[in-house]
Amino acid sequence: MEIRTATMNDLDAVAAVEAECFPVAEAATREEFAERIRYYGDHFWLMFEGDKLIAFLDGFVTDEPDLTDEMYAKASMHDENGAWQMLFGLNTLPEYRKNGYAGELLHRAVEDARKQGRKGAVLTCKQIGRAHV
């Protein structure tokens, strides 16, 4: 499995995976992802099996220690020099779940945050399923 950051070339695949993983009322739109990738594409962790995007995690960097609803909607709040790595969405296509891929992405994001000198990473989620630890 390859893990890499996002470019605008990944936009359609990212939006498609999000649409498959979240209900319409909760899923970020293609336009929101375009804005996110434009501001902080280096803070997307995309996992591929061959050429197929199977999972991803994204979030921006800020000096604010608490994740707020406003952060989901305003990619422009990203501050590359911020102390905290926010993590907004963790998506794995249904047929690839229960293989540890989400955990791999989280581990990579936390490791990258550590290497970049961040104070920590913040992930907030709504329980849709159960976490397997």
Cite the ranges covered by each PLM segment:
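Helix-loop element at the rim of GNAT/NAT acetyltransferase active sites that forms part
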Residues: A16-R30, R36
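A short beta-loop-alpha structural element at the N-terminal edge
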Residues: M1-V14
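Conserved beta-hairpin
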Residues: H43-L57
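Conserved acyl-donor/pantetheine-binding loop and adjacent beta-alpha core of acyl/acetyltransferases
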Residues: L57-L90, R97
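Conserved acetyl-CoA-binding loop-helix of GNAT-fold acetyltransferases
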Residues: T92, K98-E111
